[in-house]
Amino acid sequence: MKQSEFRRWLKAQGAEFKDGTNHLKVFLNGKQTTMPRHPSKEIPEPLRKLILKQPGIK
């Protein structure tokens, strides 16, 4: 899954985003996590799962 697709999916789940210097801060369910900002690149599956786990989605 490309990072831009993952970001759209997170936004549909209610996530809010704030730009960092080289990353995006993701706010969801009162928790914060970060993800790299490379919208055209594939996001590795382990990283995607970690980003979902931190705010308690999966």
Curated annotation (Swiss-Prot):
EC number(s) for this protein?
3.1.-.-
User: Pfam families, from UniProt?
Assistant: HicA_toxin
Domain of life assignment? Bacteria
Keyword RNA-binding present in the record's keywords: the answer is: yes
Keyword rRNA processing recorded: no
Q: Which molecular function terms from Gene Ontology are attached?
A: endonuclease activity; mRNA binding
List, alphabetically, the SUPFAM superfamilies matched: YcfA/nrd intein domain
What InterPro entries does the entry give? HicA_mRNA_interferase, HicA_sf
Q: Keyword annotations for this protein?
A: Endonuclease, Hydrolase, Nuclease, RNA-binding, Stress response, Toxin-antitoxin system
**The protein's enzyme class:** hydrolase
Stated family = Belongs to the HicA mRNA interferase family.
Complex and partners: Probably forms a complex with the cognate antitoxin HicB 2 which inhibits the mRNA interferase activity.
Function as written in the Swiss-Prot or TrEMBL entry: Toxic component of a type II toxin-antitoxin (TA) system. A probable translation-independent mRNA interferase.
Record protein name field: Probable mRNA interferase HicA 2
Please give the organism.
Answer: Photorhabdus laumondii subsp. laumondii (strain DSM 15139 / CIP 105565 / TT01)
